[in-house]
Amino acid sequence: MEIDDLTGRELDMAVAKHVLGYEVEERIDTTTGEKDAFSRPRGQGKGWVRVASYGASMGASLNVEYELQHRGWRRRVTGTVKEPTTLAEVILDHRDGRSVKAVGESRGQALCRAALKALAK
C-alpha cells in the first residue's frame, strides 16, 4: 500500500513502527474483544500498549513532530484549511535541504504521511 493511501489504524501502525521505532503487533484487545494494534519500545520486554491514534489525535501527533525534529526535520507553516472539502497539507523541510509534502483529511493525517515519506528517503 502506498503511503498516501494509508488511513486509520494502518497509518497509526506504520508511524509507530517506522517513525517512532516501536515493535508493533495486531492483537485482540482484552477490554473490547476486538482486534487492534499494540506497540512497545524495542527491547522493552513486556509493556505492550495500544498504538496511539497519531493521525487523528493532535496530542499523539506531537510525538511524531518531536521525533521528526530530533531527526532534523521541521514542519513548514502553511495556510490553514479554509473549506471543509480542502485537504490539509503538511510540508517538511530537512536541514540538509530535502523536503517532502503530504496531504490528508486532517493535519494529523497529513503530518503522519509526510513523516513516513521523510524517513523513507
PLM region spans:
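Glycine-rich anion-binding surface patch
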Residues: 1-121
